[in-house]
Amino acid sequence: MQRNFILTDVMKTGAHQTYERFLDAHSLPDQKMDYTGEYYTLHNYDLDAYDRKFAFIDRTIVNDRVCANPEYQKELLIRVRLLHSQGFKFIMASPWESHENIKSGNIYPNDIKGITSFNWTGGVSWFWWYMYDKHLNNTFKFTHDHFGSYFYKKHDFLYLNKIPREHRVKLYNKLLKEGVLSNSLYTFLELDKPVRLTQEHELPWVKPEDYPIWGLDQDITEQPYIDTVCSIVSETNDNDTDVFMTEKIWKPIMAQHVFVVHGNHLYLQKLREIGFKTFGSYFDESYDLENDKDKKIDAIVSLCKHLKTVNWQDIYRQTIALRQHNYDTFFNKEKLSAEVNKTLIGFLEFFDSSQVSS
């Protein structure tokens, strides 16, 4: 059994307890993890007894409220230098973001001169775990046939956008131009003229005009899924370098909703690789194989135009087992743990390779 010590937030400005719960979801049989989120308690531990020592530098975007403070920056460097001298390796903790977001964003610190670090980004495991952790004990009443009484959907698509990104704006404008959204529920909250849900379909505890830029994206309510046939999932990125899965895909999976995804190249393939099923037996999912971003948008728009004409009652009947499988897989602790393990293995391999190279 190898022992690992993790200081889960060097400056205690982020959400160290959230990180610790994520780490606790691992199932690596030969690894023990001990944590503290408090730098000033390190003297209570026999640090020489550990095989590995990590320190997380939290780079949550809300930390910009303190990161510009020169005193914060000075103290961070002091702590990092001291921890480094004691054999700690550093994890730049940005699991809420993708690699692309980190490269293009203004996140502090980008790196620390002379210190090798590991960039922890969201990938597949973070938001799966976060949504699992948040909603495991919640009771939802999603239904797509009014609990066996009859099949009726008021609207076609559920299509939720918040922050404008180039690929999102392109798809949104083309869907509008082609009339695809004529009978759909859709939003684009951060446009100059925001497009919002009505109160009927918004989170019941939030006024549509008061929906905040941060804090509620991982919440979910039943009505918009009950009233629509298919989610158009507008993911954060559309690159071909990595797959970043956010709450945007886990919500329709929790709701047992049919989905089309505008996201990274081979996004659906990655979903299948980690145990989920997609809808390629019921409609064309070849858009996932298209690496040209504009052609992918064209393929998604063409598919959505077609989906407005299909018999959705038949599709929902035929996909009962598939959608239940996805729901069960999402809430399967062992399958989730396997993905968390991959994240932790990345940490462990980083430490071990750093030891060799140094």
PLM features: what roles do these ranges have?
Residues 1-233, 239-246, 250-358:
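Pol beta-like nucleotidyltransferase catalytic core
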